[in-house]
């Protein structure tokens, strides 16, 4: 019987008073707001995953840096202890320093990373080579991989198949213990050949270059166990926070152990804030539309009190409902 009454009112001629118009507009707003919320958050999640994948190509799962100064000492025994920790896949030792990079008359300031042979196992940079190859040479015959932004800035040729000779770049680095009275003693110069170009994201491509760690140590006068950082890749099943805590306990207070999210905190915080802001705005729109719907239904019930009274006098139960617009 309920369905028969509902079908009769459904087929009846619709009224076009203000209450019904407001009700249908509200329904439309709720539907559109919900669809927009799902669509925008889906797009934002996809964009967030893309940004994370790009930054993960450069930032490793865990990075160890000194709590004071630019370098720290890590003995072979300490390094072996790190490698033996559960969940660690590979460890690469790194020297980072600002350097002047010259190609003939062109020059630019870069952050030069000296890395060891394990770097290919911890970083995604080797997979982002667009010209040449990821080859860093050795201390006596070093080669360098430059970012695409640096390549454009100083016109670096790193392609051995181009028919033109690969660029020989001059690297100027600060030297430990250089005389302050004589500026020339505070700097060291070395030549290296361009072997490849990587492209990840503009922030990295225009700032970072990568070369052999022994070459940088030789130029800067660093000891065999001195490093700027240790970059670590974990196994797929490893617990990132658990490994971070274990390494912090192992190394002590003289070292900072950061996850890939902590290495670029501002980026991830900004992305989270943007996501929650979008969610809050769309939820507010949805809440306002919902309140409008409740108000419209309340006015609709008041408008149809006569119809409800007639149905009740005919023996209808209170559970009978009359749909909007009848």
What are these regions (language model features)?
Residues 16-24, 236-291, 300-302, 311, ...:
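Peri-transmembrane interface segments
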């Amino acid at each position: 019987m309920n369905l028969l009454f509902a079908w009769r009112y459904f087929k009846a001629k619709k009224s076009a008073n203000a209450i019904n118009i407001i009700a249908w507009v509200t329904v439309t707003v709720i539907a559109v707001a919900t669809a927009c919320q799902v669509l925008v958050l889906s797009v934002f999640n996809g964009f967030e995953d893309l940004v994370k994948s790009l930054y993960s190509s450069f930032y490793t799962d865990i990075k160890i840096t000194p709590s004071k100064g630019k370098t720290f000492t890590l003995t072979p025994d300490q390094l072996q202890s790190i490698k033996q920790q559960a969940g660690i896949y590979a460890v690469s030792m790194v020297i980072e320093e600002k350097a002047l990079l010259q190609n003939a008359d062109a020059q630019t300031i870069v952050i030069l990373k000296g890395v060891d042979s394990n770097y290919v196992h911890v970083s995604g940079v080797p997979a982002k080579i667009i010209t040449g190859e990821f080859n860093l040479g050795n201390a006596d015959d070093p080669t360098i991989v430059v970012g695409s932004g640096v390549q454009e800035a100083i016109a670096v040729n790193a392609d051995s198949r181009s028919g033109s000779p690969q660029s020989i770049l001059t690297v100027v680095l600060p030297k430990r213990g250089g005389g302050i009275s004589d500026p020339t003693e505070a700097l060291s110069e070395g030549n290296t050949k361009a072997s490849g170009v990587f492209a990840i994201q503009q922030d990295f491509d225009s700032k970072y270059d990568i070369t052999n760690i022994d070459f940088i140590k030789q130029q800067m006068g660093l000891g065999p166990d001195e490093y700027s950082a240790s970059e670590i890749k974990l196994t797929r099943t490893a617990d990132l926070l658990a490994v971070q805590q274990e390494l912090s306990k192992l190394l002590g207070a003289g070292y900072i152990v950061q996850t890939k999210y902590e290495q670029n905190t501002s980026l991830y915080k900004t992305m989270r804030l943007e996501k929650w802001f979008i969610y809050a705005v769309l939820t507010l729109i949805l809440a306002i539309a919902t309140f409008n719907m409740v108000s419209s239904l309340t006015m609709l019930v008041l408008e149809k009190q006569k119809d409800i009274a007639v149905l009740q006098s005919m023996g209808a139960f209170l559970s009978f409902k009359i749909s909007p617009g009848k």
